[in-house]
Amino acid sequence: MKALALLVLGALGLVLLAAGAGLPLYGDPTAPASLHVADDYVRGSMVDAHTPNVVTTMIADYRGFDTLGETMVVFSAGLACMLLLRMPERGRIPTLGRPKGNVITDIVTRAMIPVIQLFALYVVFHGHYSPGGGFQGGALIATTVLLARMVLGFERSQALFPTALGTPLGLAGVAIYAGVGFVALLFGGNALDYSYLPLGLPKDMLRNWGILFVEIGVAFGVMGTLVSIFDDLLTGGR
């Protein structure tokens, strides 16, 4: 079985190397990234989506399908960990330890968590105008839960974020992202064409709000998946 797995991985590696040979060279003026399309995206960020952060417009609007796929990949990784680690009762390995009580670390942690969470919300909601977005904000919120797990202990930190919410929250994030695209489809546009969202706003502002909606979905997906993976590793799949 091990030999077969190595054979499959080796074959996959050869396929990837062969595909990589067809990629354009760095700095190639004839490469797609160096042609007029990139300039159009940069110039159109404010005009099309009323968003000064070009990176956010690129990720969540112009190539929204790709980012939806990335969000689904993150959630799929969480599902894979769940399937691998959440074994039947007999096969479980007890990996969960009890942290030693420490008043100083407890107080500092409780003081830091709301500050980090507030900054994470800023990162999500201000991603149109400064570096940030759903991936970064979701990861920051997840770190507060992970910090609580490590300092306060698994049982005590359940009040902050129950383990049972991890996978459903990740699924909800993917559903929000895909749902925004489906709503646009229902109202006569292409999937993820936010200018067709039924909000009664100018087209550029519709795309601006659409970007925010999908970024919130990404934040939910990333947060739920990261916490779910960490909890599975921490508890041995309990």
How would you describe each model-predicted region?
Residues L68-G69, H128-I141:
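Short, non-helical or kinked segments that cap or interrupt transmembrane helices
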Residues V42, M46-I59, D193-G210:
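Short, membrane-exposed interhelical loops at transmembrane-helix boundaries
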Residues V74-L83, T143-R149, F213-S228:
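Hydrophobic cores of alpha-helical transmembrane segments in multi-pass inner/ER membrane proteins
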Residues T95-M112:
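Membrane-water interface at loop-to-transmembrane-helix junctions
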Residues L4-L35, V124:
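N-terminal signal-anchor transmembrane alpha helix
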Residues M1-L12, P162-V174:
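Alpha-helical transmembrane segments and their helix-start/interface "positive-inside/aromatic belt" motifs
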Residues A21-G44, L186-S195:
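Interfacial/capping segments of alpha-helical transmembrane domains
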Residues N53-M82, N208, L212:
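Individual transmembrane alpha-helix segments
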